[in-house]
Amino acid sequence: MAIHKIKIFAGRDSKYLAEKIAASFGTTLGQSEVLQFSDGEFQPCFNESIRGCTVFIIQSTFPPSDTLMELLMMVDAARRASAYKVVAVMPYFGWARQDRKDRPRVPIGAKLVANLLMAAGVDRIMTMDLHADQIQGFFDVPVDALYASGIFVPYIKSLDIEDLSIAAPDMGGAKRANTYAKLLGTPIIISHKERAKANVVGKMTAIGEVEGRNILIVDDMIDTAGTICMAADMLMARGAKSVRAAITHPILSGPAYDRINSSALEEVIVTDTIPLRQDQNLSKFTVLSVADIFADVIERVHKYKEISSIFFK
């Protein structure tokens, strides 16, 4: 099977990560720019030929609106420039919390995003730790749903923590927590929360042995940090020795940084799918890069190799 030339490009908000992915792959980013108009419109442009190439466009959709539109327009531009195939690499897939109708008269935002990407002409999607696995079914093209456990688990093992337990911050995260517990050979704790409304948690309890344990909370994203910080404080109040968190996507909106820094959390381990704000106190944060994982998968996809063996589930 013929292997077409590969070119890797980045959206403006993911260039920091795309450069690391390209370097790990053994190349440099392709030349592109985004022209900005005075009314707020913008126009992406590839500054080199991509005719007949397999084009990988790296863009996390955070913040959710302009980044998505920029990605869609880059996919469209690549398709119109006669690229052989166009792959959207979305380390963080925004809008993923809208995976179903949870009340009357609301959209299914994640399905709409999938429709838009396919309409733009994308041939494949790569992403990491989707908020809901069923989003893969919204696409009619292949979706490589990768897992950050491949970098979190080795790091946690390197800490050599005694009396370690894995905790889910809510019932929805039980499957992920169970996976980490199996990989690390630890007990599991399930937290249960009652939300008063979006981003507002009411009360919280825990199921499992907490007293005397060093606890690692695992989740796919951290937004306002209300749930994680409340869980950490609750677990410490119930006798935990320490509480850490391993979170793939550090959205960290609103009061998140202040909440984390004033909480019982000893360490917050995140990835670089979304950059941390450098104007904040980051003393509790440890950042692990997903660049090598994505570079490996890009190479395997480009050379038509299987990728299932590198999945950590």
What is each stretch, according to the model?
Residues M1-K313:
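PRPP-associated nucleotide enzymes
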